[in-house]
Amino acid sequence: GWMLDYPSAEDYLNPLYASSSADGHGSNDGDYKSAEFDKLLNAALAQTDVKKRTEDFTKAQEVLAKDLPVIPLWNDNVAAASATNVKNVSFDYTNLPTYNTITK
């Protein structure tokens, strides 16, 4: 599986689907290559405006959904329980509790 290192779509899209990561040069083990995807990914990577960057990442993901270079077999879920007097229990992008927000 693949675990997110930091909260950005780039952390999945670039190493797993960029043409530059194919042919043994990264984790694109299916050797997926798409000029359209690469163009959108590179546009997102060059973008400094967060909203526009997100739009480019979304468009790149739409190309992946259309091409379907991989078939996801499972997705990580998280479940938790807490006492009724414990508040603000939430989880971060790695599915770990955000301990600094929990209050009693």
Predicted features by range, described:
Residues 10, 14, 29, 41, ...:
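Generic hydrophobic alpha-helical scaffold/packing signal
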